[in-house]
């Protein structure tokens, strides 16, 4: 039985490493675009901004989820994998916010109108989420599972609060 667990852990780790390499390449491209152009100039059409923010939020959720799975004991804790996911999370957590500009409230989006009606409240929620995710990143890089566990709860609550207030189900 122990051999099966060991094999499973190795397979999960290898899968995570393969996914990480592909994700790092994608994030690198996204990051390059994000840094190369002013926020509004990035998007030729509102649909482009919506796609961009949805993609960056999806990547952010994937890496947060991987860290959460380790914190919850659903997958074995691996300090290197945690740090690698944290590196991606640190970059991606900065990306989606510029894509909530004017005209991006319509189309294929679950964004609520409150994002634009209560823009200061939305900015505060986004800033809080980024701050909490920064704590997750720092905790993951320590290699200490307990530190990661402690940081995940507040970050998850921050994400949930933003979703509850600003995202349609």
Regions found by a protein language model. Name each.
Residues 1-19:
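Short, Lys/Arg-enriched N-terminal segments with co-localized hydrophobic residues
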Residues 26-27, 40-45:
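N-terminal leader/targeting peptides and immediately adjacent processing regions
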Residues 11-13, 37-39, 60:
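Intrinsic low-complexity/disordered segments
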Residues 43, 47-79, 85-169:
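Sequence context surrounding c-type heme c attachment/ligation sites in exported
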Residues 5, 17, 33, 157-160:
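Secreted/extracellular small peptides and ectodomain modules produced from precursors
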Residues 27-34:
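Bacterial N-terminal signal peptides
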Residues 19, 35-41:
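Sec/Tat signal peptide C-region and signal peptidase I cleavage site
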């Amino acid at each position: 039985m122990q051999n099966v667990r060991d094999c499973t852990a190795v397979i999960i780790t290898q899968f995570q490493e393969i996914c990480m390499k592909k994700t790092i390449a994608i994030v690198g491209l996204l990051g390059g675009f994000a840094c190369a152009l002013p926020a509004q100039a990035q998007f030729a059409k509102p649909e482009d901004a919506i796609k961009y923010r949805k993609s960056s939020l999806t990547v952010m959720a994937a890496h947060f989820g991987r860290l959460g799975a380790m914190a919850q004991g659903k997958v074995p804790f691996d300090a290197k994998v945690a740090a690698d996911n944290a590196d991606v999370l640190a970059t991606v957590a900065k990306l989606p916010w510029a894509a909530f500009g004017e005209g991006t409230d319509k189309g294929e989006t679950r964004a609520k109108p409150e994002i634009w009606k209560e823009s200061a409240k939305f900015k505060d929620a986004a800033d809080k989420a980024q701050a909490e995710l920064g704590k997750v990143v720092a905790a993951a890089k320590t290699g200490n599972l307990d530190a990661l566990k402690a940081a995940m709860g507040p970050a998850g609550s921050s994400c949930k609060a933003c979703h509850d207030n600003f995202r349609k189900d």
